[in-house]
A protein has these predicted regions:
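Mature-chain termini and adjacent capping regions
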Residues: 1-193
Length: 193
């Protein structure tokens, strides 16, 4: 083999090695960048459910309907839905419907327990209770209303820390957390105060 052919073969081999090294360095890094970007995109995706409605009926014929403008599954517990602009309707046999409104709620799809929060309002047969929080235990048929509770009835107003309601017996317990404080009651006289 002549020295001219040997030099040409060496140059071709050198160019091939340079191209291979460049390919491995630059193209493998681009693949990693694309994978990282895809992972960042996946982390930023939020799954929202729009116009959500659940309806549950127990063995006694009582029902609970919960509706929401939007919601998503909790990152921490897959049975919990975090809902926005929520309406809950409780229908107990031989009783008036109870309507609960709130800005947000955490709804357990398995137990039907619901924690309503932010601008909560409960309406029932001419009665209205506003608060910051309301917890409804559907199985036990009770409601616990707390934090900044304001009740308004036909002839009175009431301010307390906690109101507990048994939905079956209609028994209510109203009290303050601090025993030194009293529940504040305003009575209307002759239809006005």
């Amino acid at each position: 083999m002549s020295s001219k052919s040997l030099i040409q073969s060496g140059i071709v081999l050198l160019i091939s090695i340079i191209l291979l090294v460049n390919y491995l360095i630059f193209f493998s890094k681009n693949d990693d960048s694309v994978k990282i970007n895809e992972a960042e995109i996946d982390n930023n995706v939020e799954n929202k459910i729009l116009e959500l409605k659940y309806n549950a009926v127990d063995a006694d014929g009582n029902s609970y309907i919960i509706e929401s403008n939007a919601g998503k599954v909790s990152d921490k517990e897959k049975n919990i839905l975090i809902l926005e602009q929520v309406t809950g309707i409780i229908k107990i046999q031989n009783s008036e419907d109870i309507i609960i409104l709130s800005d947000f709620a955490n709804y357990n799809k398995t137990t039907l327990d619901t924690y309503f929060y932010d601008n909560v309002r409960l309406k029932y047969d001419g009665h209205s209770i506003d608060s910051d929080e309301l917890f409804m235990n559907y199985v036990d048929k009770n409601i616990n209303i707390r934090n900044n509770v304001r009740y308004k009835g036909l002839n009175n107003k009431l301010y307390a820390d906690i109101v507990e309601i048994d939905l079956v017996t209609k028994f209510s317990k109203i009290y303050m957390l601090d025993n030194q404080k009293k529940v504040k009651v305003e009575l209307k006289q002759n239809g006005s105060n």
